[in-house]
Every structure is written in C-alpha cells, then in structure tokens.
C-alpha cells in the first residue's frame, strides 16, 4: 500500500492486471500506468512518467475518465488526459501505437502556468477558454478506419482516419441514426469500451446521468425499432444493470 498513489480503473490482459495511476502531492515519482501482482495486490512495474508523457499532469479529474479501451482480442490501448500518444499494452511491454501531432495540443508550458491555481476545476475552466486540444478518448479501429474523440472548449470532436486513403476527417456532427430514429438527429456520443475488426461495443446506463437520459429515450420511443433486442428495453428500470450495445462496421 502506498498512500501517495491510487488507481481508478483496471485492465486484464494476457494473465496480468494493469491499473491507471494517480499520485498525491509529495509523491517521489509520478507514473501513469502500473502492473499489479494478482496474488498479493502489490504493484510490480511502473510505466509512463507523467512529466514526459502527460504534460506533468497526474490527477484524476473526470470521474468517469476511462484511460483503457480493449480490443476483443489483442492489445489493449491506453491514453491519459493530456497525452498526444495512444499506447498499446503487449504481452512483453508498453509500446507507442499512434502519435498525434497538432500545434493546438495543450502543452506542458501551459499547464505549468496554471500551477498557482490550486483547484483542478479552475484549471479546466481556464483551459476551456482556450482552443487547446485535450483528452483523446473513445479510440477504436477497424480494418480501414481509426476513430477517436478529443475535446476543445469542453466540446467533443470526432476524427476518422482512413488508412486506405491516408487522410483524416474531423467533425462535431455525426448523427446516431443506428440507435435512434432517423428524424431525431441525436449526436453520436457513445462510451466505447471495446472493439474488434468488425464491431465496436459501447455501454449505456453506467452512471446516473446516462441512466436517466437512456431511460427517458426509451420512454419517449426515441430508440430505433430496427435495433435487435429492442423489445427487451421495455423491462429496463433505474435498478437495471448497464446496457451494452454493439455497432457493426460496414464493409
């Protein structure tokens, strides 16, 4: 046990358990990722120094912050709030998988300039008054496309990278006409948790906010009747477990 560090999420892969890692003020080192011994729960390995890879930031700010996303089979991916690199966890080590470059990424110099601001909420308020990019999340990949989200001014942006054409497309507006009826115009904002070459999995009702929204969508008949298993939604209540939905990629 180390009272100067804690974890929020775990990831199992290839017989090992990994956790994200956050540290309190006064910690001797600030790593972002650790491996945990499955027998005694002690941390055995540490990776990704926060200063080098996350602009020095090593606090948990967003309660539902999800640094891991796992392929159904294969290497889990890992990225933190201010990282410009998505890492792959392999059976042997941790490897950079995708590096993103933009002059608009939040910089270490900018975060250092906020050190006198003691409250993280104020730091993010200041950040959202800029046009800086942060929080790469919801990463997934098919045979042809790479998809991920990022934020500017607390607004969600969507990026598609076409491996065949070697080109990227950015937008804020992708309508989720798969889950919702066509005329609703509901924006695509899934919480992806896993993917493979043919489909992606998202989770709904995994917190109070998404639970209330999803239950109201069902009540208001906003869910597309073409969704397989939609009849089972009628028995869902606020006491139900989270709902996992999968989206199939088109060829």
Segments predicted by a language model, with ranges:
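Asp-box/WD-like beta-propeller blade repeats and closely related beta-sheet repeat scaffolds
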Residues: 1-30, 43-58
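Structural signature of eukaryotic scaffold interfaces centered on beta-propeller domains
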Residues: 6-15, 22-24, 58-80, 125-143, ...
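Residue position within the beta-strands of beta-propeller blades
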Residues: 19-21, 78, 148, 202
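Structural motif
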Residues: 25-35, 82-89, 152-161, 208-222, ...
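Loop-centered beta-sheet repeat module
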Residues: 36-95
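Conserved blade-ending motifs and adjacent loop-strand segments that build the rim/top face
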Residues: 53-56, 96-130, 163-197, 209-211, ...
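Predominantly five- to eight-bladed beta-propeller fold
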Residues: 96-116, 217-251
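C-terminal structural cap/anchor segments
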Residues: 135-185
